Amino acid sequence: MNVVEQYNLTLKIEVLKEQSAETLARLCKLVDRSGTSDCIEVIKAYSHIVNTELYLATSINELEALKSDMAELESNIKESLAQISHGVSDEKCFKENSDVLDIEAYSSDDFDKALERTIDLLMFNKNISSAPHAVILGGQSGAGKTTIHRVKMVESKGDYIVIDGDTYRAQHPHFRALQEKYGVDSVEYTKMFAGKMVEAVIEKLSSLKYNLIIEGTLRSAAVPINTATLLKSKGYIVDFCLIATKPELSYLTTQLRYLEMLVVNPLQARATPKEHHDGIVKSLISNSNELEQSGLFESIQVYKRNLVQVYNSKQCTKPVGTIVENVLFGTWTQDETDLFNVGKAQELELRAKLP
């Protein structure tokens, strides 16, 4: 598979992951409201595809097959709930949420239920490790961190648990009502919930000694340093992996991801403000140096978008920031140029599909 095909596959995985994470959250809420345990195993099967099998897909055809499997599982869950006849439906749940006066708020019970549900699903078909390993990821929005998810998942045969705060937004008890009311700005009203969920999930799963991949941006060095300190205190080996991508290419990717979602379901589309993206880029060099100097990490690794590892602190003597700067702002390679040109063509095609 060439670099353009890898890029397209990763982009489709990212979009499908976001869509299916929202579907999973919605199905979980429906099952919870039904009061039945009949669908739990089917929910777990759906979750395993979302949280593991998507990352192991090696072709668009495999991805389409997984998409078909998820659609069948979703249909089975809805049919089972209809047969139970508890009067549970998407529309009823949404109406009840819409009637809540303060949809931005949530109770401790709401959070605890969402946390318990999330933990149970993430642990499904995963193994506790006697020598637990964690990989903390960094890179600006659109850099392609899913690339590293895929690399590490293949290396471990799917035995990492991915912790990604964006996929927890949909667990907010009033998520759909927030989307209806605020549109693309709804992310501002779910970020505190998602952030709290990430902290709680890390705390719980690290206490149980599961292997973890923890999504991040490296907007601040303090967050990965604090996370690594916590994990090392629990006996973890911790690596930091940065995906280094030309800013022009990563921002274009955020646009493509947004347009893909906009075409399928405008309510699910989530735009990335350019100032937010560029702010992360500006901090990557100094923050990566700070992480290396902290001495907390077993290794600092840097990957490019084409899956090539260009830096490993165990083998290189140069400061990591030097390598990061060169990849971000140095001469464009032919692969990078090809990816950008393909991306611009895809952007035009997607915009043509909009109403």
Regions of interest found by a model, annotated:
Residues 252-355:
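Conserved GTP-binding G-domain of TRAFAC-class P-loop NTPases and closely related GTPase folds
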Residues 97-126:
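N-terminal pre-Walker A segment at the start of P-loop NTPase domains
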Residues 234-254:
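Conserved phosphate-donor/acceptor-positioning beta-strand/loop module used by diverse small-molecule
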